[in-house]
Design a protein with these regions (language model features):
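Catalytic and substrate-binding clefts that recognize carbohydrates or anionic sugar/phosphate headgroups
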Residues: 1-156, 177-188, 480, 546-560
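Extracellular structured ligand-interaction cores
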Residues: 8, 63-67, 72-74, 161, ...
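Aromatic- and carboxylate-enriched substrate-binding clefts and catalytic-loop regions
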Residues: 24, 35-38, 190-448, 480-482
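Generic recognition of flexible, low-complexity loop/linker segments
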Residues: 55-57, 64-66, 150-153, 184-186, ...
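Short acidic-glycine loop/turn motifs at beta-strand connectors
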Residues: 70-74, 81, 259-262, 518-519, ...
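N-terminal small/glycine-rich loop or linker at the start of catalytic domains
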Residues: 154-169, 264-277
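Catalytic core of carbohydrate-active enzymes
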Residues: 340, 344-346, 353-364, 388-396, ...
């Protein structure tokens, strides 16, 4: 679809709009991470709005965004991600449909030549591909096939050990003594060292990449001490420079910053300090920033980085860059491919057509609550959405959530969160289980042991396949039998490869749950005895299993007729 005008003028109306009617007999998957993550997708009300990564977007959009959708009947709808000012919505109130449109208005990034902030194109093209396939799995594979693969796995330590981050317990008040105390407590409480992530506010001024000398008087010695304890160490960074920093002064002098806004320095973000964004369209600016990160590694021995932000929603309206952004999501792509990809031990939170990145793609911050509204029940739907979008190396948010607003998990929530997380590709801790209760500590330790016995023997093969083909490590249950309609709405189970079904308990107070097993012979896996050969289950079938607080229901396929 195209729309043309005789002259380059601001257009107050959409150039083109495509609507796909959603029939009641099919279920939809893909699109994006949402603040209220529902599976299947037609359960959600996704207001029409800009389609690019957001930090709590106005239409509920999150930081991981794709441009394809598949349904349970094998239909694939894919939109060109390079469409300027692409908007999308699905099943908005009173409208049972999916809508795609390039619009000449929105929020965040706007066309730089437009005084009004609206779009400025003589011709705008909306490219949409619709194809029919035999089933939803085949449609998903068709959607993944044109995407770039990383061709290398993230470092093995991510899978074999855990990430421990300072965020949920210290937030911005982190200090050197707090960091070392966390590392020592991990070992003292029987957990293995892994990757220790020093989160926000280790710097005195954002962008200078220098430890706050009051909070971290001896950073190099600290990192050496953490290494001796068996940890690799990563630092939190973002593409923003604090205006009072020497880095910002240097970048401003060199022309490495995004301009625009009134005044030019205005940049809305979650912090209170005035900041400027690095111009990632400027190769010299990117090289300057990457060199500074590499210099920091050499000077103090840090092993990698947690790359936060990168969403174009933070850029000022009328953003002026060295090279005009072709579409807003390009800023995210530059952050991931040009910066984060330079560091093997790394993770990002924002993604849009960045499946070629070889690090971890994490879920957004979760609240310390049970529900699907950004709590425990949103983890599996987000994991499965990542699988459909081509991000197999998913990092779930920290066990127990972020402990914002005075929240803190009780024993039950902490245990169930750990059980839901430990068989995902990577597990991340921040709230120490031993600070919740002795029971929580013991159950979380047991969950880690389950990971070692169930996932680790399989992870190398699955991760190698994911690196070359984007085949998900953790898969929707319909992946095992894509023609079985019973699998289409299961939002609280997932498969590991083709032979394990994981069914965490995510309902508060539940001590049993229904589990669906696809075709084949299934045996329950038990922590102490291993596979229970006494009670085989022949699928497809629903069963009810006991799930006391210490138990994570797991089933292993021993024979398949598929």
């Amino acid at each position: 679809m195209t729309s043309a005008s005789d002259d380059l003028v601001d257009l107050p109306i959409p150039a083109a709009e495509l609507t796909v009617e959603l029939d009641s007999g099919s279920h939809w998957y893909g699109g994006a991470h949402l603040l209220r993550q529902l599976w299947p997708l037609e359960r959600a009300n996704w207001e029409v709005g800009p389609l690019y990564p957001f930090d709590h977007g106005p239409n509920g959009l999150g930081s991981v965004v794709g441009t394809h959708w598949v349904n349970s009947r094998g239909l694939l709808v894919a939109v060109d991600p390079e469409t300027p000012m692409l908007h999308a919505g699905l099943n908005a109130p009173l409208e049972q449909r999916s809508t795609f449109t390039p619009r000449y208005f929105g929020v965040g990034v706007q066309h730089k030549k437009s005084v009004s902030g609206m779009g400025y194109y003589d011709i705008c093209v909306l490219r949409v591909a619709v194809s029919a396939h035999s089933d939803v799995r085949t449609a998903t594979l068709a959607a993944l096939s044109p995407l770039q693969s990383p061709h290398q796995m993230p470092p093995a330590v991510f899978f074999q050990r855990s990430i421990w981050t300072t965020w949920a317990t210290s937030h911005a008040d982190i200090t050197q003594s707090d960091t070392v105390a966390l590392a020592e407590a991990v070992i003292q409480n029987g957990f293995q060292p892994g990757v220790l992530e020093i989160d926000d506010r280790w710097q005195s001024r954002y962008g200078d990449l220098k430890f706050d000398s009051l909070k971290f008087p001896h950073p190099k010695q600290m990192i050496e001490q953490l290494h001796e304890l068996g940890f690799l160490v990563t630092l939190w960074v973002m593409p923003f420079l604090q205006e009072s920093s020497s880095a910002c002064s240097e970048a401003k002098r060199l022309g490495y910053l995004v301009d625009g806004g009134k005044p030019p320095s205005i940049l809305r973000w979650w912090g209170t300090q005035p900041v400027r964004a690095i111009d990632l369209t400027n190769d010299e600016a990117v090289e300057w920033f990457v060199r500074r990160l590499q210099k920091l590694q050499l000077e103090i021995g840090v092993d990698g980085f947690k790359f936060d932000a990168g969403e174009p929603c933070f850029l000022p309206k009328g953003a002026l860059t060295r090279r005009q952004l072709r579409y807003p999501g390009e800023y995210t792509q530059l952050w991931v491919h040009k910066v984060a990809s330079c560091f093997p031990l790394s993770e990002v939170r924002s993604s849009m057509w960045t499946s070629g990145y070889g690090g971890l793609v994490r879920m957004g911050d979760r609240d310390t609550v049970w529900g699907v509204e950004n709590g425990l029940q949103s983890l599996i739907p987000a994991l499965l959405t990542s699988a459909v979008l081509g991000y197999p190396f998913t990092l779930p948010d920290m066990v127990g959530g972020n402990a914002y607003w005075g929240q803190f998990p009780d024993t039950e929530l902490m245990i169930r969160w750990a059980q839901a997380s430990v068989l995902m590709p990577v597990v991340q801790w921040s709230i120490p289980p031993w600070k919740v209760s002795i029971e929580a500590k013991e159950a979380c330790f047991a969950a880690q042991r389950i990971r070692e016995k169930v996932l680790l023997p399989r992870i190398e093969k699955l991760a190698a396949s994911a690196a070359t083909s984007l085949l998900p490590i953790c898969r929707p249950i319909w992946w095992l039998d894509p023609l079985d309609p019973e699998t289409f709405c299961i939002d609280d189970q997932f498969a590991i490869g083709v032979d394990v079904v994981v069914a965490p308990v995510v309902q508060q107070g539940a001590r049993e749950r229904r589990v669906y097993l696809p075709r084949g012979q299934w045996l329950e896996w038990r922590d102490i005895a291993g596979i229970d050969h006494c009670q085989p289950h022949t699928g497809p079938c629903w069963i009810v299993v006991e799930a006391p607080l210490q138990k994570l229901p797991i089933f292993v396929l021993v024979h398949s007729d598929n």
